[in-house]
Amino acid sequence: ENNRVVIDSRINESGTVYYASDSDYQKLYSVDKNSANRQKLSDNSVCELEMYDNNVYYLSKNDRHLYRANDITGEEELINKTVNKIAVDDGWIYYQESDGGKKSGVLYRMNIDSGDVERLTDNSVRYPKKYKDYIYFNLDNDNIMYGITLDGTSLVKLSMGDSDVKLYPFNCFYHGDYLFVEN
């Protein structure tokens, strides 16, 4: 067996690394911190890895379905069939619903324990990115950058988005309480 592993997406939780292996078509694996006990967790090609409460949440690259895989039992469960982007935090899954194959869609959050779903935005959004207590995004029809609180109660406009200045969440990086934008 090839002992060389190329890692694409990865997350580290208490000494275990979860990753999509480039050498196995982005299948989901885990390995402990000393590179022993490598274990395949899914036959799906995966992306958008998130860890919460002994579960790895991910999107299947083939159909963009949202799954949960238990890191102990290896059990997989289909959570949602229409997802583009995900973030998991404090008992909630935040996701962008797929809009007919487009890279835009309405933002939702789902309670992990109850399965209750709440709509966060009325309009379709692009490029959602969660940081601390906000999800940043552009609307589908403009270049203005917004932030919305995780419960959807407060919307903040962060840029004017005129024709000369276009701000996108994927051009941002975060440090402490600051949001930095590369333009």
How would you name each of these model-derived features?
Residues 1, 177-183:
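Short, intrinsically disordered, charge-balanced linker/junction segments flanking boundaries
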Residues 1-36:
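An edge-strand/N-cap motif at the start of beta-rich repeat modules
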Residues 4-12, 44-53, 81-90, 122-132, ...:
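Repeated scaffold domains used in trafficking and secretory/extracellular systems
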Residues 11-12, 20-22, 51, 59-61, ...:
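Generic beta-strand structural signal
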Residues 17-20, 57-59, 94-96, 136-138, ...:
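Residue position within the beta-strands of beta-propeller blades
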Residues 24-29, 63-68, 101-108, 142-147, ...:
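Structural motif
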